[in-house]
Amino acid sequence: MPVISIIVPVYNVEKYIHQCIDSILLQTFTDFEVLLVDDGASDHSGSICDEYAHRDSRIRVFHQENAGVSVARNKGLCEAIGEYVTFVDSDDWIKPDYLNELYKCLLERNRGKGLILGSFEWVYPTRILPVSVEDMLLYHADFYRLITEFICGRMMYVWGKLFNRELIISKKIAFIPDVSCFEDMLFVLDYCCYADYILIKSNYNYCYRVSYSTDTLSSRINSYECELSICREFLLRLKLYQDYYAIADAEMQNAWRTITVLFHKVILAIYCHKNQYSYSKRIRYLRELTLNNRNEIKRMFLPAYLADKIAKYLLLYCSNVCFDIWMRFLYKINFRRMFGHKTN
């Protein structure tokens, strides 16, 4: 049985997948398996993965219909047999000592059921930006800092970390299938509910490729019901941590700012062109939203532009009809900037 399982969700990355897999095979720590999960790629990514599997017995490939990164990672977790698990995105790559450094940190803690994480580098087309973190050891009593400090930083991604697979299995921790925004943050928060410690090391062995997408925010929005469910999943976890660690509301500001985009997507889901909800359904959704989530709206609806400020005022202090008229007007004139994002 390998010590470490490396899970790589793969989707339309034929341009980068060679560099990703090659970097894994060049690891100085060699007791690992690689699980490449082809999430219905329409390019040659899947066949490239198969070629690597034929050449190296440590590689296993799984092909599935396109279901999203969360489902692909869950497939990897179901098939993994290693004692520990790490995730690598298929357009990123790792330096030769990535696994070795993480595992050495684990041995320092006599293994245990913790979370090991290192730092990383943002890789832009024209420059590389190392992300500096200080060496740190947190025990369970200190995990409130996940919410008060780290949630708004760069430490909540699922990659660049080493997880205990037994803990994941025993606590039935998994990625939520419909979540494609901050899905890794949910997983990390769930895992840390049961972890004994978090060990942070300032080694730059993970290289994160920063890509510039031409997608608009609306093109990445699901149905209203789906977006609301995702937002509630985050609110549930924030409330859990806040209650358990008795975190004051004033210390939750970083958390609210971080998940603002989720609430923005809930609102935009009502109005984005692909959903085409009727007037009566839009008003019903707005009524349900304001009736049951008024305090959360005040915290999460953080205006970035004048149009947003007007929208927030109408939603909270005027009628739902007024808000609906305003939002429909903005979409009718093809207004391009709402909630700090490009929407059309």
Feature map (PLM): residue ranges:
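N-proximal low-complexity "stem/linker" segments adjacent to membrane-targeting elements
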Residues: 1-25
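Short loop->beta transition adjacent to catalytic acidic/histidine clusters or analogous donor-positioning motifs
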Residues: 2-4, 25-36, 44, 56-60
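A conserved acidic beta->alpha catalytic loop
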Residues: 23, 38-48, 89
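Glycine-rich, basic loop-to-helix element that forms the pyrophosphate-binding segment
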Residues: 64-80
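Donor-binding/catalytic cores of nucleotide-activated saccharide
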Residues: 69, 90-225, 244-246
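Short aromatic/hydrophobic "clamp" motif used to bind/position activated sugar donors
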Residues: 85
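Catalytic core of nucleotide-sugar-dependent glycosyltransferases
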Residues: 203-212, 218-248, 262-294
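Membrane-interface aromatic/basic loop that binds lipid-linked glycans or pyrophosphate carriers
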Residues: 271-344
